[in-house]
Amino acid sequence: MPRYSKWIRVVLLVLMPLLLPLVAAGRGLLPSADGQERLYNVRIEMEKGGMTGVCMMLRDSTGLHGSVVNEFGVGLMSFSYAFGSDKVRLHSVFGKMDKWYIRRTLRRDLRRLVHAMRDGSATYTNDRRGIRYAFTPINEDDTAR
């Protein structure tokens, strides 16, 4: 029996790094069913500052709809992501961020963040602009308190 346990350990050590991304993707960071919603702690960090808040995402048959609100209740942005066209549409953006070049960057980064979250990662970094996005899921147990 000890001879087989060595082989089992070797197989597990080899397969574990290959299986972990699949398990993380299966766990899913995005809402998985129509009508399901998820809450996330959001942290957007830039060179000169950052923003934190809460994001609520809702999935329907066409895609995802999300809204980010800071701790004071001020809406930072509302967006939607269409599965079919693989595009993000910004519905509203906070006044100081409502510039065409910021909206374009947000649109592109949110699209890449959705792809990263689909693959099991909760963060995305825009190296060109030096912006780091982190969407950490909030457990339902944490919101019940």
Please annotate each region the language model reported.
Residues 1-6:
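N-terminal secretory signal peptides that target proteins for export/translocation
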Residues 11-21:
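Bacterial N-terminal signal peptides
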Residues 22-36:
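N-terminal presequence-like segments and adjacent domain-start helices
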Residues 25-29, 41-50, 54-56, 74, ...:
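Mature, soluble, non-transmembrane domains
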Residues 34-41, 61-67, 119-124:
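Short, hydrophobic/aromatic-rich segments at coil-to-beta transitions
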Residues 54-72:
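N-terminal beta-strand/beta-hairpin edge segment
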